[in-house]
């Protein structure tokens, strides 16, 4: 394709094709934009308010598919956008339209909000030719613009937090939802990065005992048109349009450095920051969506298109389009974005939404995909925590256990199994044993470690913990979709009444079941993830899909009742136990095999009679009580030597009635000390039970015992 070169204007010079984006060097700004199929790129400069286009300059050079130029008099604060010329041939995958002002994919800051208008679309709305038509209206008045920034920031000299995986406990939270109703956060900064710097809020997170805050998407995103028309918004933010820029509404100060200040506060509190990132699609939607950025820059390069009908998009994301990470420049954009957040912004890790897409070739998922390989070998990214949501909406999209070494994965099988077990479903013990021990059936391969299993019983997507035990069915009417949205696969149980109740027996059982679910989550092998608010029984009133509820339904209510305070204290105890006992977070998978050299098993599964579980026990569909003996003498590493951990016994009883459980035989003078009982959470603990005692395990309860050697004092 031939490209016309015009004389270089006096105020712009050739510049450089690298780095991509707008880069200030102290004297001017270098602009560089990838487009393999464009014929001309115009840089549009705007006034200080971002409202009036004051100049349009053609980028003078084209090197290795990068359009570039240098403005010696430009500086931070300059607001800009691009108009990209080229063929408008949707059937060939090209949708260039210079009437549409486009965001820089590498923009570090956004200015303004998107205002929905027919001018946003590259085609004429209502035309009989649909997206094959061509719209000539200027979209500039309706779109956010890019802004040049000065990245300078003075970081305190402190070592990185770098919490070891075996000590990691993830706290999944929505930035806005965390602080919007927090009474100690000043109203002016609620819902922003500055809000998360609040000392009282950080103190709560720190006292809770978690180590790593995982924020739902904070990249610049777009509110869907249909949501705005119905008085709602895209609260969760899984509709990204700018992978290098924080969402403007989250900047109380209007300055990007506010994000860095938040990171510094988290790190000062000893907390890691993990970002939930959405690199699988963009807010531009399908062929009938708006032209905001990549569609107008180089649609055929950025997106996966149907091979025989390039007018249409492959939709493995379920949102209308799918980014093509098999294209080297798209792969570069994503890895550049990750490195930017990890280095310039000092983020500690990433959770990848619909991560299967990031490893897709045309033939399906491949763990040797360029993106996954790049993350593993990159000197920056390989040191970050990398967490996959290991599924997408495409064929073969469910890849739990399929990611390569170096990755952790959301383990939805843990969630489903644990919920089903405590609900009282039959036949759950064999799978429960696997999930309690970090799902070795999924992850014990190629040197992967137990931390690869990110265990959760709730996530942002679905019921809260309280709602899991309070509702049989979702109640999403507030979303305006006739309760059709959100999953029906909830594995929940209302315990006799749908929703709130004053019945004291139901309330007590629900609270105990929440303690059971939390105990199973936080005392299992693997990496636990707790959702913000679950620690004190937050409810969403049965709505399991609050993606559009930027209001009190989606925000955390920090006003705690007695039940909330009780559950919070219990959760803090659980997390303290997890950190106190290394045997609850081992670096090796528990296999249950007898080690002849040491004379112990790392894990022994016990029936209520105290005997080791047999095949008959495992295949008893109605069995609902299980003991898990973790021997502290078991080999903790690859070196043949005895461990020096405590020996613990976990007993889980999902029967409605109490069960007599014979505690394991121990040496004379030793005994079992009860550390935790979800039926008696506030009773004095430390009661000691002697050799081979019979213990009455309450119905629907979880217990934790520690083996005390002869002469040892009871644990208080």
Give residue spans per PLM region:
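Conserved, mostly hydrophobic/aromatic
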Residues: 33, 82, 173, 215, ...
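Short, flexible loop/turn elements at secondary-structure junctions
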Residues: 35, 61-63, 73-75, 86, ...
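Conserved alpha/beta catalytic core and glycan-binding cleft of carbohydrate-active enzymes
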Residues: 361, 367-532, 537, 545-549, ...
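Carbohydrate-interacting/catalytic domains
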Residues: 1-171, 176, 193, 205, ...
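Core domains of carbohydrate- and sulfate-ester-processing enzymes
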Residues: 86-154, 225-233, 239, 269, ...
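Structural recognition of the beta-strand scaffold that forms the well-ordered cores
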Residues: 169-172, 212-214, 242-244, 349-351, ...
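Substrate-binding/active-site clefts of carbohydrate-active enzymes
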Residues: 139, 174-347, 354-380, 397, ...
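A generic secondary-structure signal for well-formed alpha-helical elements
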Residues: 78, 86-88, 177-182, 209-217, ...
């Amino acid at each position: 394709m031939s490209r016309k070169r015009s004389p270089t204007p006096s105020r712009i010079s050739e510049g450089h094709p690298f780095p991509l984006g707008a880069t200030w060097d102290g004297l001017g700004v270098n602009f560089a934009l990838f487009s393999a199929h464009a014929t001309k790129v115009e840089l549009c400069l705007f006034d200080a308010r971002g409202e009036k286009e004051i100049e349009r300059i053609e980028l003078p050079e084209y090197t290795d598919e990068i359009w570039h130029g240098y403005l010696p008099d430009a500086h931070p604060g300059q607001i800009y956008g691009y108009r990209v010329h080229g063929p408008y041939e949707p059937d060939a995958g090209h949708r260039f339209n210079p009437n549409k002002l486009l965001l820089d994919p590498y923009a570090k800051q956004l200015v303004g909000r998107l205002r929905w208008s027919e001018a946003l679309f590259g085609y004429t709305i209502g035309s009989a030719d649909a997206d094959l038509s061509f719209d000539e209206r200027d979209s500039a008045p309706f779109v956010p613009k890019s802004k040049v920034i000065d990245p300078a920031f003075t970081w305190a000299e402190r070592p990185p937090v770098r919490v070891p995986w075996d000590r990691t406990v993830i706290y999944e939270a929505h930035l806005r939802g965390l602080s919007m109703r927090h009474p100690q956060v000043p109203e002016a900064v609620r819902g922003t990065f500055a809000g998360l710097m609040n000392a009282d809020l950080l103190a709560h997170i720190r006292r809770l005992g978690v180590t790593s805050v995982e924020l739902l998407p904070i990249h610049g995103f777009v509110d869907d048109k249909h949501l705005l028309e119905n008085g709602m918004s895209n609260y969760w933010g899984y509709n990204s349009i700018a992978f290098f820029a924080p969402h403007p509404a989250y900047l109380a100060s209007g300055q990007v450095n506010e994000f860095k200040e938040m990171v510094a506060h988290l790190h000062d509190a000893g907390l890691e920051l993990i970002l939930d990132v959405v690199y699988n699609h963009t807010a531009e939607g399908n062929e009938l969506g708006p032209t905001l950025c990549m569609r107008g820059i180089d649609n055929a390069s950025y997106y996966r298109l149907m091979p025989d009908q390039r007018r249409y998009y492959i939709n493995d994301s379920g949102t209308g389009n799918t980014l093509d990470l098999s294209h080297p420049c798209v792969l570069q954009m994503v890895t550049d974005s990750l490195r930017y957040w990890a280095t310039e912004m000092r983020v500690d890790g990433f959770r990848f939404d619909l991560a299967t897409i990031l490893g897709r070739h045309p033939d399906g998922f491949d763990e040797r995909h360029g993106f996954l390989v790049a993350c593993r070998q990159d000197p920056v990214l390989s040191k970050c925590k990398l967490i996959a949501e290991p599924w997408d909406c495409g064929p073969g999209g469910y890849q739990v256990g399929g990611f390569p070494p170096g990755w952790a994965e959301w383990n939805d099988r843990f969630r489903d199994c644990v919920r089903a077990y405590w609900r009282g479903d039959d036949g759950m013990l064999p799978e429960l044993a696997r999930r309690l021990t970090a799902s070795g059936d999924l992850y014990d391969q190629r040197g992967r470690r137990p931390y690869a299993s990110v265990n959760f019983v709730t996530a942002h997507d679905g019921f809260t913990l309280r709602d899991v035990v309070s509702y049989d069915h979702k109640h999403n009417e507030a979303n305006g979709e006739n309760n059709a949205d959100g999953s029906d696969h909830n594995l929940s149980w209302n315990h006799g009444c749908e929703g709130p109740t004053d019945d004291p027996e139901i309330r007590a059982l629900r609270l105990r079941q929440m303690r059971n679910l939390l105990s199973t989550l936080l005392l299992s092998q693997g990496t636990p993830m707790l959702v913000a608010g679950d620690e004190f029984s937050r409810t969403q009133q049965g709505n399991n899909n609050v993606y559009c509820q930027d209001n009190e339904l989606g925000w955390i209510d920090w006003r705690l009742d007695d039940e909330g305070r009780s559950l919070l204290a219990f959760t803090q105890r659980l997390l303290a136990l997890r950190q106190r006992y290394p045997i609850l977070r081992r670096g090796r998978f528990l296999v249950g095999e007898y080690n002849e050299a040491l004379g112990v098993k790392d894990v022994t599964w016990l029936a209520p009679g105290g005997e080791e579980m047999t095949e008959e026990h495992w295949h008893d569909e109605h069995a609902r009580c299980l003991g898990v003996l973790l021997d502290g003498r078991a080999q903790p590493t690859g070196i043949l030597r005895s461990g020096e951990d405590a020996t613990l016994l976990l007993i889980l009883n999902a029967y409605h009635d109490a069960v007599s459980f014979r505690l394991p035989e121990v040496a004379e003078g030793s005994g079992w000390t009860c550390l935790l009982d979800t039926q008696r959470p506030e009773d004095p603990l430390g009661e000691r039970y002697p050799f081979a005692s019979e213990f009455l395990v309450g119905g629907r309860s979880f217990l934790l015992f520690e083996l005390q050697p002869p002469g040892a004092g009871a644990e208080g």
